[in-house]
């Protein structure tokens, strides 16, 4: 029992020691866990700031990036699908001419930092303002946009604004020297396909100083020439005869293709100006002049033959033929020898000076033009030989139609000469089938031509477009068939016109007391097609009492000016009455 008593306290003591050790070990382990839990947030923050301290597996990062990319793309597609119906509704509300611009600007717009809300507000504002505009304003803006596009697409903006107008700068010089020049207008169909029917017609102009001669030549084109300034003597050479005619201002003449001719300016002081309508024979739009003599500007057509052919043709040695007809062309090519030779027509070119004795000899047997009655079958005729077909105090309109002109009947060409006084207006009209090429002879003014917009651009509707230009001497403009036109003269204006396809052409005026097609409409039709009533339309038409030509200044403006002058005079008189 005593041993048991001793062992029991010892056992209890041992158990107590073990318990204390266990408690101390547990406390120590708990403190360690607390410290670890306290340090982990700091470690996580540091890991987030610098992920390289604890890198994740590479394949896990790739999967996460791919997942994010797919999520963003799907969200973008959903947003785009939600926007598409709204965009289509906005496009349907906008005018059709603005859709193409919106489509072109849509892609760049996605890249702009501007918000979608701002873009929608701008688009809705522009579409609503466009709907509020009148048809006339939309047409004006559309014309401006098309003109800007044409200006940007080509360097010559003026040419693109009006394809029917050709300034005097559009002439190309063929020959020029100190005695004059010969030049040709560019092809009518070169700038637009709207004038394809004029591809075989060209305008030629030559000017020469006093006492000069344009050398003999023939051409592979028919000509109708008109003297616009000065006087001339033209000699026409045929195989069996030679005829000379004296031409004055306004005289015209048919010159058949292949006819050899030469033109003299016999005046001592006045320059000569002649305009020709050329109709090429061999190649549409192109023609060539053939000269029997050589000069510094061209070679003789004899030089194109071989020596054997020339010797057999003239039954003479080639050396003699060369010295008489061709000249020493080798010396002409040598500049030093060329400038050392005595001055002759070969030095001057195709326009040479002549002496007064030579002028008298060339004019000895010349005939004058026909100034009364119908033109002859050959020989010159004057455009103002008959009374004008339209005339009043504001202007005169002369015309020679193909049925009255045997020379131009087979060419189906008419000739017109129009005189519009300063401040007058040639009333709006159109030609039923003739295309007119008009040359400004003298004066200044402007014209307005009405055409239909190109159907390739506007297939859903036909809208008119106005072509206008300032006119000055030497300018050319074209009046297509069926296109209404009006001409305003800011100074005394003189116009020469060549009518193409002129047989049975009819000129229809759109205003005035006579030959007015609008006036001839039925009364019921007038009330149906115009916004006003039939009575208002007829009253409006009758307001213009003039025919063909009228005052270019509106009556209302004249009345306001008269009232203004009267008001100023009345105001001054009232002041004077108070003083005296």
Curated annotation (Swiss-Prot):
Signal peptide extent: 1-30
Q: Which UniProt keywords apply?
A: Allergen, Glycoprotein, Seed storage protein, Signal, Storage protein
Q: Which Pfam families does this one have?
A: Cupin_1
Q: Where is the composition biased (Basic and acidic residues)?
A: 37-72, 79-92, 134-145
Domain (Cupin type-1) spans 164-322, 381-538
Q: The organism sits in which domain of life? A: Eukaryota
In residue numbers, the region (Disordered) covers 37-165, 549-569
**Residues carrying a glycan:** 229, 488
Task: Please list the residue ranges that the record marks as compositionally biased, kind Low complexity.
Answer: 124-133
Q: Which InterPro entries match?
A: Cupin_1 (IPR006045), RmlC-like_jellyroll (IPR014710), RmlC_Cupin_sf (IPR011051), Seed_Storage-Functional (IPR050253)
Task: Report the family membership.
Answer: Belongs to the 7S seed storage protein family.
Q: What does this protein do?
A: Seed storage protein. Accumulates during seed development and is hydrolyzed after germination to provide a carbon and nitrogen source for the developing seedling.
Q: What else is known?
A: The variability of the residues taking part of IgE-binding epitopes might be responsible of the difference in cross-reactivity among legumes.
Q: How does it assemble?
A: Component of globulins complexes which accumulate in seeds.
Q: What is the protein name for this chain?
A: Conglutin beta 3
According to its UniProt entry, this protein's organism is Lupinus angustifolius
Per the UniProt record, the lineage of the source organism begins with: Eukaryota, Viridiplantae, Streptophyta, Embryophyta, Tracheophyta
